[in-house]
Regions:
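Helix-adjacent hinge/juxtasegments
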Residues: 26-61
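Acidic catalytic patch
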Residues: 16-17, 49-73, 80-89
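Short active-site oxyanion
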Residues: 7-10, 52-54, 98-102
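Conserved phosphoryl-transfer catalytic core
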Residues: 20
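Acidic, PIN/NYN-like endoribonuclease modules and their adjacent C-terminal/linker elements
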Residues: 13, 89-128
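Short, well-structured N-terminal submotif of metal-dependent ribonuclease cores
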Residues: 1-16, 27-40, 125-128
Length: 128
């Protein structure tokens, strides 16, 4: 799904770090992954956020859009903020004459909402 040769930019909402670390830690605590593997994943993610990803800071505009998306799409809080950040990146791409952003999520409910907001969506679970 992601081809580094294409030199694509990866944008993540600032809250993504909290979500990733929490999800990996919970899986480790439930023994679905080992503590060592969890530590490796968390450390790699922290490194990637610092070196490879463009972090979208939480602005008043994104928070307000997230609140609206919670109401209109029935999304959970962080999901609504993720979608608001994706919409903001897409808007910047289009204004700048760049191709539209692709919203990447494995959450089917969030993907339906993103599609209804006009975003192109890719689900990583669709790629073996």
């Amino acid at each position: 799904m992601f081809n580094s040769v294409l030199n694509n930019e990866v944008f993540v909402a600032a809250i993504t770090g909290v979500e990733i670390i929490a999800a990996v830690t919970r899986r480790s605590r439930s023994s679905s992954i080992s503590g060592d593997d969890a530590a490796i994943v968390c450390n790699q993610f922290r490194h990637d956020v610092q070196t490879d990803y463009q972090v979208i800071e939480m602005t008043e505009k994104i928070i307000n859009a997230g609140m609206s998306l919670s109401e209109t799409q029935g999304l959970r809080g962080y999901d609504a903020v993720q979608l608001a950040a994706g919409c903001a990146v897409n808007e910047l791409c289009l204004i700048s004459g760049l191709p539209p952003a692709i919203f990447v999520s494995a959450d089917n409910e969030l993907n339906v909402a993103a599609t209804s907001e006009g975003l192109a969506v890719e689900n990583p679970n669709s790629y073996p």
